[in-house]
Design a protein with these regions (language model features):
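A conserved helix-loop-beta module that forms one wall/lid of the active-site cleft
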Residues: 193-206
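Extracytoplasmic/secreted proteins and extracellular or luminal domains
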Residues: 64-67, 196, 386
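Short, conserved phosphate/pyrophosphate- and ester-handling motifs at nucleotide-, phospho-/glycolipid
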Residues: 47, 101, 234
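Active-site core segments that coordinate phosphate-bearing ligands/cofactors
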Residues: 4-5, 111-124, 130-166, 177-187, ...
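Short, acidic/turn-prone active-site loops that include or flank metal/cofactor-
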Residues: 32-37, 97-105, 172-173, 256-258, ...
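N-terminal glycine/serine-rich phosphate-binding loop of ATP-dependent small-molecule kinases
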Residues: 1-95, 121, 141, 201, ...
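Short beta-strand-loop/turn "lid" adjacent to the catalytic site in phosphate-handling enzymes
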Residues: 63-99, 126-130, 158-179, 202-205, ...
């Protein structure tokens, strides 16, 4: 049995085929880049119909090349926190708000949760612009057209493709409206959002499986009999794909953005363990949660620096970074895109310090990259407090794969913990497939975890 793994991210849509051993089939990959609208006013949106077209293009490409012939299951890793308003016909009334969008703010006349700590413990989130409790009223006020209901981007896309497209437990937890214990919409969170149950997606039961609508079964006949598994949040998928599936290992992932996360078994309808005040908690599925912190900055800082600072190319840049002494980096506030919850800094809050006429582009880059490392430390300590022991750290993500120097910098900052590098290139797809197959326990064997690079040149010594 082959598995089609879809990665519905913010910057790209990807589809790849995995074999029965959850290994990528060579060559069976299609990818389309997504055009985001990002502005200094905090805008971070994308076009839902354009996104759907990119997904269709990926499926067309894989189908035309014969890669879908033996696919029996579709697994999905999807961005958390996106939302768009829909009309009575189920079509978008405006663009999709992604996690990047920092514009939504509560009404000055609206009070927040009656007991903020209890709200945080129950939903794993805060009354914050990243979550639907703040986003939905803001969307209503700015839409200009009456909104019939709201959906995440993945629910909208699947509603066009499948005969049925309820919201998975994992995706629902990212809205901030879900009670993580009872796995139903939280009444207080819904009241803050100004919605009733009928304006929200239906929640998927644990055994839900979808199938293509007849028109798309004819378009992709080799997928006609495939079962579609509930989507899981991309962060949860990355943890599983990294082999970080229990309380002994934390995943630090740096892609476009960055995050530190710990996965734990916490079945539904069982009281949840206490949650530290600065951390969020979302669902992987009905049996597991992922706890952690996420940051707006990661590989996007490198992309900005590469575009603006005229950096050396490839190997020359890596060599220049290794040649720096620890004091050569420049201090940086890396909140270029603002804060993710629970912080409230807006986009445009980044700063560079310690500049002189002798400061080099490589020194500026090193300061930015160290800033990404250092933001993880306090939140990792908070995660460790929930398990009362130091954890092993597994680095992963595209930005980590691209820079041995950055991996070594992380190892130095996070010492004396053991820090290793997950070399598997498809951690999100692999994680989603493992969850869909009920094989989370196999994740460690598949993760291909190796040692980090020499720490001495990029560490804190």
């Amino acid at each position: 049995m082959n598995i089609l793994a879809l990665d519905l991210g913010t910057s790209s849509v990807r589809g790849l085929v995995l074999d029965g051993d959850i290994q990528p089939v060579p060559g069976a990959l299609a990818r389309r880049r997504i055009d985001l609208t990002v502005d200094d006013d905090g805008t971070g949106t994308l076009d839902a119909r354009g996104y759907l077209a990119c997904l269709f293009d990926c499926l067309d490409e894989l189908s035309e090349q014969g890669w879908l012939r033996e696919v029996e299951l579709v697994a999905i890793s999807a961005q958390w926190h996106s939302v768009l308003p829909l009309g009575a016909d189920g079509q978008p009334l405006g663009p999709v708000l992604t996690w990047l969008d920092t514009r939504p703010e509560p009404s000055p006349t609206q009070a927040g949760p009656a007991d903020p700590d209890a709200f945080h413990q129950r939903t794993g989130t805060w009354w914050h612009r990243c979550y639907w409790s703040v986003r939905l009223p803001w969307l209503r006020a700015h839409c200009g057209t009456p909104v019939t209901r709201f959906a995440g981007l993945v629910e909208y896309a699947l509603s066009q493709l499948l005969d049925d497209a309820p919201m998975s437990t994992s995706q629902a937890s990212g809205t901030g409206l879900l009670d993580l214990c009872v796995l139903d919409w939280d009444p207080e969170a819904c009241a803050l959002a100004g919605v009733t149950g009928g304006e929200l997606p239906e929640l998927a039961p644990p055994d839900w499986r979808g199938r293509l609508r007849p028109a798309y079964a004819r378009r992709w006949p080799t997928l006609a009999r495939a079962r579609w598994a509930p989507p899981i949040g991309d962060g949860a998928a990355s943890n599983v794909g990294s082999g970080c599936i229990d309380h002994t290992r934390a995943a630090v992932t740096v892609g476009t953005s960055s995050a530190v996360r710990l996965l734990q078994r916490m079945p539904a309808n069982v009281p949840l363990a206490p949650l530290p005040p600065q951390l969020w908690r979302y669902r992987v599925d009905h049996d597991h949660v992922v706890t952690g912190a996420a940051y707006s900055s990661g590989g996007n800082l490198f992309a900005w620096a590469d575009r603006v600072l005229r950096l050396p190319d490839g190997p020359a840049l890596e060599a220049a970074l290794w040649e720096l002494a620890p004091d050569d980096r420049r201090p940086a506030n890396i909140a270029f895109g603002g804060d993710r919850p629970p912080g409230h800094r807006r986009a445009g809050s980044g700063e560079l310090g310690g500049l002189s006429f002798g400061t080099t582009a490589v020194e500026l880059l090193a300061g930015l990259m160290y800033g990404v490392c250092e933001q993880v430390v306090d939140d990792l300590e908070a995660l460790e407090s929930t398990v009362r022991a130091p954890v092993e750290v597994i680095l992963g993500g595209g930005a980590m794969a691209a820079s041995p120097w950055w991996r070594a910098a992380f190892a130095g900052v996070l010492a004396p913990r053991q820090v290793r590098f997950g070399r598997h290139p498809e951690i999100g797809a692999t994680g989603a497939a493992l969850v869909a197959c009920g094989r989370v326990a196999d994740a460690v064997a598949l993760a291909d975890i190796g040692q980090t690079d020499d720490q001495s040149s990029a560490g804190t010594a």
